Amino acid sequence: TTQATLTPEIIVKNHAGNPVEGVLSGKVGDITFEQPVKLAANEEKTVVFDATQFPQLKMKNPRLWWPNGYGTPHLYDANFTFRLNNEISDQKDFKVGIRQMDFDEKNHVLNLYINGRRFIGMGGNWGFSESNLNYRGREYETAVAYHAAMNFTMMRNWVGMIGDEELYDACDKYGIMVWQDFWLANPADGPDPYYPDMFIANAKDYVNRI
């Protein structure tokens, strides 16, 4: 791949009771970009950085993220910072991989493709990390490393039981795809959520995060 077009989308929220104006800046690898942002009192919005306005987002010769066994799961350092009056209001540092995922259902069979190559998901279900919910970064790091050492390429986050960032960070690092369930055991035959609003909020949070 000689070029990848990035389109960062960042959710920002003004927790103050008055409008604010600031600058949202981002960095992915060596690429930097920024734009002014206006927020009404208590407003939440999605700020989009589009390559038509920021041509530097057309990354040349990107190092791609590949699943375990298909190549190196390369990750870029990323940062997003929001400034008010030239002072940092909030910022987030994380790592991000560049990859393209596609699928089709030819002959009623689900086929997955990563960066144009056919991908075979091999792995198993993960429910709770363990019964006392004591897993943190070190434990997830070890468990997912074992997953990769067994030549697995995917795990299913069964019924969305795990929401820890450390799990997703470890999967990014070791090239493990995540089949993310929503918070339902059997959507076709129930039971339906007792609290639909909570369920929808949980689903939106997962979509925004991963």
State the predicted function of each range.
Residues 144-196:
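Aromatic-lined substrate-binding rim segments of carbohydrate-active enzymes
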Residues 84, 175-178, 210:
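A generic secondary-structure signal for well-formed alpha-helical elements
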Residues 140, 164, 199, 203:
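Aromatic/hydrophobic pocket-lining residues that form the small-molecule binding cavity
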Residues 196-210:
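An active-site-proximal structural segment forming one wall of the substrate-binding cleft
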Residues 1-154, 158, 162, 173:
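Secreted/periplasmic carbohydrate-active enzymes, especially glycoside hydrolases
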Residues 130-133, 184, 208:
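Conserved helix-loop functional segments at active or binding sites
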